[in-house]
Amino acid sequence: MPPIAHEIAASLLRAGAVHLRPDQPFTFASGLRSPVYCDNRILLGDVAARRAVTAAFTAHCDGAEVLAGPATGGIPWVAWAAETCGLPMAYVRGAAKGHGRGRLIEGVSVKGRRVVLLEDTVSTGESVLAAAAALRAEGAELVRCVCIFTWGWQATATAFSDAALPLVSLTALPELLDAATAAGSLSVAQRALVEAWVRDPQGWGADIS
């Protein structure tokens, strides 16, 4: 990844958006145990970090006529990047409105327009790929999806490949691990635990209390 990926990773750690706890794993609502927790909503309150992320997003908006994102995580980034680039924006609801015009996509019309999709975090990709399908159903031509962070799971890469949607991540787990190691907050043994989780997230952590 380019040098900016390491800068973004360091920004996420400084802002407290990412927590590494391989010896005391987090448990997600799904029951999945994880040595890493990422909440990029924290960045909304960190002016320096959000400016850095917005600038990084705009570098990947070439070729776009519209910027769009899924509700709710993508909305602020789409708004800031669209303002910076001087582009119109849209966002995709989780479900169509149950009243009024019953719209699923809000904002500018995407029909016949080249759209870059922005998201904060991509895990399995399920929600952002649903948004992509909705945009395509409205006639959008999707250029790429850009996210702040992704875990690097092979299943996610496969899902985006199957959807014929290029995925670009501003930073990823290796860069975060490099930043944490450089800061002295992650040992070599702890890093190995995190890397093992990436390879097998479902089976990881059975022997950790």
State the predicted function of each range.
Residues 65, 113, 143:
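Conserved acidic residues
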Residues 76, 99-100, 152, 177:
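Generic structural signal for helix capping and beta-alpha/helix-loop junctions
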Residues 1-63:
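Active-site-facing substrate-recognition patch
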Residues 59, 79, 83, 133, ...:
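Short, well-ordered alpha-helices that flank and scaffold nucleotide-derived cofactor binding pockets
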Residues 61, 107-111, 159-160:
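Solvent-exposed alpha-helices and their adjacent loops that cap or buttress functional pockets
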Residues 77-119, 124-130:
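Short, glycine/charge-rich flexible loops or terminal/linker lids adjacent to PRPP-binding catalytic cores
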Residues 2-14, 133-209:
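PRPP-dependent phosphoribosyltransferase catalytic core
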Residues 64-71, 146:
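Short glycine-rich phosphate-binding loop at a beta-alpha junction
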